[in-house]
């Protein structure tokens, strides 16, 4: 069977039997149509227990790529934190107790929704309660979502948080959309607005809930809420403690850098803070205490390929680069031997409905160059279905799928020419459900299955009831490498 192999991850494209407001179904996609006719294909599970999340919880890019790259189901931080709260282990956490003993005033920062991709509202509330009951003065800094949940669901979430804070005697200090506070593409002007808000130098209002409603009246949805503070909030002090409740790292790293790094030079800062505590490891370069340490994941797909002396290329545009490197490699940043990484810059637009093709064609070129060079294994992510799906723009999402389809056609042709096997799948769905039955925009991921296509010598059928954790072993089987005991079985 030995062949070189390309693994193509079409982010945010899933299978929805309902064709209404389904951008995948509505798109012109000759490459996909050809794949369905000519290549063995099936459906894979990408949500809930199949990827180590709670039952019914939608999958996400971090979890999906971890599952694909490690070849096993890893119980995610969301599940670990839920257990720690239920068993009252969180309040006994040594690093948390140290911070609460050292700092009288404590700030809780995080995305406040039940999306479960970056955070959970229940984790935010549990942390507020632990800190308040300990006798600390506590400040809540809520980041509104509108992306992993519906665009105006923030009103109910923030109403809930406001009441919770009042009952606990906690200060509801600031409000800001994730567009500003959770940027991951080095748009430092956005993060600066939030930094200044945390310091007490933003627009002041008497009631943050009323401000949110006023923003809706001006057609500003949750993701884009401008950084605003309660008029009674005076800002962070350098001796204060700061706790970040997001368990996913990629959209918190920049904010932590701004608040904590002594070497930061992107803009002038008035204060730098030392007493930070993060829910999980955001970046190995941050020498900060964490609540939930990383679980060690050994014998990942990339490690096995590297140890065998084979070459590999990992490529994506900025928005998904961390997913085909850090997450795919089991939460490790360091470059492996014979591993090449190619980062293609994402377009500098406010939201990707402005440019639905994003940088897909440049990413496609990088893959074709890798095939022509003779890389033994290539993994690539096309971000379009997910990133454009998140905008809620149905027509733009159709164009996004069509751009991916064009790229698939070119890569498949190139792979066949150079006798490469290929596997095509998605980490989760999104753009196949852009509105609900009532006509409300859906910008979040779905819990639908995703397609998988396998073109490799000797493969005529894919086993039933498979998931993302079965892909790594499939790649190793194609490369004719031994499958480690930690991995789940192959797809064929």
Curated annotation (Swiss-Prot):
Catalysis: reaction(s): (2R)-2-phosphoglycerate = (2R)-3-phosphoglycerate
Entry binding sites for Mn(2+) 1: 386, 390, 445
Cross-referenced InterPro entries: Alkaline_phosphatase_core_sf (IPR017850), BPG-indep_PGM_N (IPR011258), Metalloenzyme (IPR006124), PGAM_B_sf (IPR036646), Pgm_bpd_ind (IPR005995)
Highest rank taxon of the organism: Bacteria
Active site: residue positions: 61 (phosphoserine intermediate)
GO cellular component terms listed in the entry, alphabetical order: cytosol
Keywords from the UniProt entry: Glycolysis, Isomerase, Manganese, Metal-binding
Residues involved in substrate binding: 118, 147-148, 178, 184, 248-251, 320
Cofactor: Mn(2+)
EC code: 5.4.2.12
Residues annotated to bind Mn(2+) 2: 11, 61, 427-428
SUPFAM superfamilies in the cross-refs: 2,3-Bisphosphoglycerate-independent phosphoglycerate mutase, substrate-binding domain, Alkaline phosphatase-like
CDD domains given in the database record: iPGM
Cofactor binding summary note: Binds 2 manganese ions per subunit.
One example GO MF annotation: phosphoglycerate mutase activity
Annotated pathway: Carbohydrate degradation; glycolysis; pyruvate from D-glyceraldehyde 3-phosphate: step 3/5
Gene Ontology terms: biological process: glucose catabolic process; glycolytic process
EC supergroup of this enzyme: isomerase
Family: Belongs to the BPG-independent phosphoglycerate mutase family.
Function field: Catalyzes the interconversion of 2-phosphoglycerate and 3-phosphoglycerate.
The protein's assembly and partners: Monomer.
HAMAP family in alphabetical order: GpmI (MF_01038)
Protein name according to UniProt: 2,3-bisphosphoglycerate-independent phosphoglycerate mutase
Source organism per UniProt: Campylobacter jejuni subsp. doylei (strain ATCC BAA-1458 / RM4099 / 269.97)
């Amino acid at each position: 069977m030995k062949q070189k192999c390309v693994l193509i991850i079409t982010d945010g494209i899933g299978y929805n039997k309902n064709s209404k407001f389904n951008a995948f179904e509505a798109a012109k996609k000759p490459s996909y149509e050809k794949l369905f006719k000519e290549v063995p294909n099936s459906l894979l599970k990408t949500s809930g227990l199949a990827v180590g999340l709670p039952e019914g919880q939608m999958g996400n890019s971090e979890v999906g790529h971890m599952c694909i790259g490690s070849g096993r189901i890893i119980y995610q931080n969301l599940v670990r934190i839920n257990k720690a709260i239920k068993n009252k282990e969180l309040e006994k956490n040594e690093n948390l107790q140290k911070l609460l003993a050292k700092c009288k005033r404590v700030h809780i920062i995080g995305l406040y929704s039940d999306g479960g991709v970056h955070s959970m509202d229940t984790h935010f509330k549990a942390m507020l309660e632990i800190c308040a009951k300990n006798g600390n003065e506590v400040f809540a800094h809520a980041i509104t979502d509108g992306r992993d949940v519906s665009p105006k669901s923030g009103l109910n979430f923030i109403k809930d948080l406001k009441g919770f804070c009042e009952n606990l005697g906690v200060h509801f200090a600031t409000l800001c959309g994730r567009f500003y506070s959770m940027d991951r593409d080095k748009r430092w002007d956005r993060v600066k607005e939030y930094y200044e808000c945390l310091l007490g130098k933003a627009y002041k209002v008497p009631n943050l809930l009323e401000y949110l409603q006023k923003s809706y009246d001006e057609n500003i949805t949750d993701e884009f809420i401008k950084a605003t503070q309660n008029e009674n909030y005076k800002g962070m002090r350098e001796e204060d403690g700061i706790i970040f409740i997001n368990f996913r790292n990629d959209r918190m790293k920049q904010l932590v850098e701004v608040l904590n790094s002594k070497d930061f030079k992107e803009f002038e800062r008035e204060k730098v803070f030392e007493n930070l505590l993060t829910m999980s490891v955001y970046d190995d370069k941050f020498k900060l205490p964490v609540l939930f340490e990383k679980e060690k994941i050994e014998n990942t797909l990339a490690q096995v390929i590297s140890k065998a002396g084979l070459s590999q290329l990992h490529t994506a545009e900025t928005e998904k680069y961390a997913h085909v490197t850090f997450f795919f490699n089991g939460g490790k940043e360091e470059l492996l031997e014979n591993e090449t990484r190619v980062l293609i810059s994402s377009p500098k637009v406010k939201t990707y409905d402005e440019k639905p093709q994003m940088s897909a064609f440049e990413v496609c070129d990088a893959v074709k160059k890798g095939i022509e060079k003779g890389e033994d294994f290539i993994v690539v992510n096309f971000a379009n279905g997910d990133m454009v799906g998140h905008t809620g723009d149905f027509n733009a999402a159709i164009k996004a799928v069509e751009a991916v389809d064009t790229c698939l056609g070119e890569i498949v042709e190139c792979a066949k020419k150079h006798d490469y096997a290929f596997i095509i799948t998605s980490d989760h769905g999104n753009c196949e459900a852009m509105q609900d039955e009532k006509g409300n925009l859906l910008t979040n991921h779905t819990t639908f299955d995703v397609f998988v296509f396998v073109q490799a010598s000797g493969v005529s059928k894919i086993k039933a009831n498979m998931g993302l954790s079965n892909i790594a072993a499939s790649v190793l089987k194609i490369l004719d490498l031994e499958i480690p005991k930690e991995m789940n079985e192959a797809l064929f």
